Amino acid sequence: RVLDLSRLAAGNMISHMLADHGADVIKVERPEKGDDLRTWKVNNISHWWHVYSRNKRSLSLNIKTKKGTEILKKLISTADVFIENFVPGTLEKWGYTKKVFDSLNPNLIIVRISGWGQTGLYKNFPGYGSLVEGMSGFASMTGEENQGPLLPPTALADMISGLSGVCLLYTSPSPRDLP
């Protein structure tokens, strides 16, 4: 079972690939707003959402309330994989430390995605694919010779992050298998 609390493309890419390969994915969304990916629309249709949410079960849950916290903890205790892409430190601020995760489910594999990593100079800044594509130099390698940098027409950095995440999950040993 996969518990996905991520928003937008990178985390959804991971859980979408796992769901396509048969995993039971529970997508946890904010009440009333849902996943921000729902708002990426063309002609009032969110094609992104339809692609990335397929084969998943969706749950609206306010994890900042007592009832929401109780439900989330029950879900964590039955999950194999937990995916999140909050700004580093957010889960800890809400009381979800490594110690808490371990007490709920010592075999849980946690996938944490952030634009700038969990440590380092930019860790507290929100990260978006277009920023990463620009700062990495990728955008300057595309386009025409006499043109400025050109961003890709898709969420390329997020998709690559998601594919990297799912590859790591497929190749990582399960905590159950470690000594």
Where are these regions (language model features)?
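N-terminal helix-loop segment corresponding to the beta1-alpha1 unit
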Residues: 1-168, 172
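A short, hydrophobic C-terminal helix/tail in secreted or cell-surface proteins
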Residues: 173-179
